[in-house]
Amino acid sequence: TSDNTFLYENAIDELNSMLNIYNDKYLLYPVLYFYGFGNGILFKALLQNKNHQHIVVFEKELEIIKIMLHLMDFSQELKENKLIILDVNSLEFQDYYDLCSSNPFFGFSRTYFLELSSDYYEKDKEEILNLNNNLIDKFKNAILSSGNDSKDVLQGIEQLIYNLPKMITHTAYQDLLKKRENLSDTAIIVSTGPSLTKQLPILKKYANKATIISADSSYPILAKHDIKPDYVVSLERILLTSEFFNNNFGDFDKDILFITTHLTHPQTIKNLEKNNRNFMLAYRGSEFIKYLKIKNFGELSEGHSVANVAYGLAVFLRHKNIIFIGQDLAYSDDGFSHTKDYRNLNKHEGHYERDFGHFRTIAYGGVGFVESSFYWSLFRFFLEKRIYITNQSGFCNTYNCTEGGARIEGTIEKPFKEMCETLLKNNLNKNFPKIVPLSSHKQNELLLKCYYKIIKSINHCKTFKKELLKSYNHIQESFSNLNLISNLDEGKEILNYLIQEIDKTKFKLEDEKMLDLYEILNPILTQFELNLARIYVLNPKTSEDSYNKSLLWVKEHIEFFKMIYTHIKAQEKALIKNITPLENELTQRNLEKYKRKINAKYNF
């Protein structure tokens, strides 16, 4: 190598040792990860095993790769992506995201480990630890983004059904985008990070020259300082968020459009209605909404923070410049989580001490580090993903003018005052076109359509529960009978039959007719398959090992089907419980006869 050290002490012995280990423990692993290319012979040998779909190699000394690729032909492996070589020095956010969120890498993320191809690479200890931590973090983020909490999903479905009449009888998100795109060059997104306070005087001075998009938590702060936003965006489904609207600012609210999600807490709507605020509900990332087919009311940008949604709105309205302020995504030097005007500051007491040292990230400006949190790190991940996509389009510049907190990759870091002076020369005509609700006739049509779909889904829950229970009882009974069988071959035959029966049931779960249940089932399906991968890669050495692996496989699926049944039952109850506002709306509109026809069709 360039530093006159050897890649191997004894190449043949080390190769044989590694092959013995991998052919023993990791024979069935679809994906293997290595740091260091070495002489490449190990990868050539491992890829003879058809179970290994991909070998991912991270290397920082590209000269080694050039030499070895010259000596050995890997053209076919590289062409088929069986061998993936990544330069450690140039890895970016998108590289990690593409790897960790796509299959089979994502599907086998819980079997991930990083191995050194030889002892030579131990000298890169710091880079290896950093790489390993990045991969683990990105796999975690990918899992979280796919959904991991069924209770959250159920709450979202409940509140969606409850809120449907309010959504349909208010303005549609797509109408907003059509009527107001290209009306403003610059949008300023206001969040409640610790750095916001110092930016408020500048924001007030330039508020009439740009579109102001406020997070719900920033709205009371802006009202206090008499800075009127054009849009206030709310994302959370919890009751606490509704308190941001439990106030009366009188004429200040005139011409502000409040945008909240389909799954917002009903109290948020009550607080908005109480003072006659102009609001709309828009959906985001909802499989049940896709089932209802009301496309005109979405789709808000994906992501786990209100800043993501606000940024998506700014992009969809075709702003050429988007500026973040108060988007710290980190604690201040004195340990504060938010600006000191933030109404829920006391809810975050002790969080700085809890998170200290665990989520440290690069500071704004690229010098030093700041303390972040798990959720801020997650928010930043999705925001950076969205910014990357926007940057690829080339029509918009994204500026981080927070002047504090964490660095957000993909943004241009500039002082807020400088960007206002550069971009905001003239007043903006804020007499934006009015967005009106759909006609009464169209509303009636959508209300009835949604009612029909919900009743149909309730019926689907009932019928599929029965079908699933029948399959479950059959599999459970056959599985229990294994205790009465002493012959291994006979037991294996029964297990193979049960695995086929399991596959038939799982195939039904993937049918497009299950669209109304995708949302409630997706979190447990994802988590189950990720955990199942750990069983899949077990390498049985004996007939007993093979039998026990199949036994474990069937046992896990029996428990899984019980969970599926419970979740479908929960959705059925949620739909029945929360359909009342929609029923009342239909009654008020003299649509009772259509409601009765739908109920009769499905015996509801």
Task: Tell me the role of every PLM-derived stretch.
Residues H52, P229, H319-I322:
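Proline-aspartate-enriched helix->loop->beta-strand connector
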Residues K209-Y219, K224-N271, Y283-G285, L292, ...:
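Catalytic or ion-translocation cores adjacent to nucleophile or general acid/base/metal-coordination motifs
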Residues V190, Y206-K209, I213, L235, ...:
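Alpha-helix capping and helix-loop boundary segments enriched in small/acidic/polar residues
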Residues F58-E61, A215-S217, I325-D328:
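A short glycine-rich beta-strand->turn/loop micro-motif centered on a GG-aromatic cluster
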Residues P266-I325, L329:
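Active-site/ligand-binding-proximal alpha/beta "capping" segment
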Residues S301, A310-Y388, F395, C401-K417:
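Catalytic cores of enzyme domains
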Residues T1-A187, P194-T211, P220-K224, Y231, ...:
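N-terminal donor/sugar-recognition subdomains of glycan-related enzymes
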